[in-house]
Amino acid sequence: MDILLLVKAAIMGIVEGLTEFLPISSTGHLILTASLLNFTGEIVKVFDIAIQTGAMFAVIWEYRVRLRATVAGITHEAVAQRFVRNLLIAFVPAVISGLALGGLIKEHLFHPVPVATAFVVGGLIILWVERRHRALFGDRDLEGGRVARVETIDDMSALDALKVGLVQCAALIPGTSRSGATIIGAMLFGFSRKAATEFSFFLGIPTLMGAGAYSLIKQRDLLSWGDLPVFAVGVVFAFLSALVCIRWLIRYVSTHDFTVFAWYRIAFGGLVLLSAWGGWVDWKD
């Protein structure tokens, strides 16, 4: 087994875990990182999605108490039933749009320049939503007071879930960010930052699980048992880095907004576009 390949897999796993739940696009960062590392070949077509299962398991582990209670109460507790219903409703639009448009989008947009453009556009949208949120609530949302219509995920209606599910479809465009679309979209629909962030975490479980399973089944002919160590390293590092990120982000959103991520997206995306335009970096597709 090529040690350098394992190191690249570890780096990719760390990038996935640190970016999956931040509004900065894990797919975009993986595409750019793979380009810089020259991490290419048939295996990459499956690897990027497969290692997302590591991030998914981090959510399951961090919220294992809530998830265990939900499973135990699914047959007789209204709160558990509503929670599962909302997750399923929010998940369905991504399934439909992914099956209908996924191949076309992957063919035309999974390249560094479109990703960088989406980074910049997404950053501008976050700035606008944060400005709107602050105009409505001031700093009260950062001070622990109840200000939003949906203060916790238990306050959600089926319509709320559907709207969040629809905005998640925008994340099919690489560089948009699944967590960014769901968190910022939820805030636009009246969620508190914490409720938006937590629902985005939970929605990632069926979304990442479904995407990973579909990719592995569809691309199974590209895989061999010899690839297992590479995938295992990527998944483990994605799990560990995602766990750190989840715990940090929940604390962060209690007292901070998402403006810093918007400026990061704009600066990073702008730098990639500038380097591509100037020919400073050979961004490999």
From Swiss-Prot:
Pfam families: BacA. The keyword Membrane applies. It is a multi-pass membrane protein. Keywords: Antibiotic resistance, Cell inner membrane, Cell membrane, Cell shape, Cell wall biogenesis/degradation, Hydrolase, Membrane, Peptidoglycan synthesis, Transmembrane, Transmembrane helix. It is found in: Cell inner membrane. One of its GO terms (biological process) is peptidoglycan biosynthetic process. Belongs to the UppP family. Catalyzes the dephosphorylation of undecaprenyl diphosphate (UPP). Confers resistance to bacitracin. This is Undecaprenyl-diphosphatase. It comes from Methylibium petroleiphilum (strain ATCC BAA-1232 / LMG 22953 / PM1).
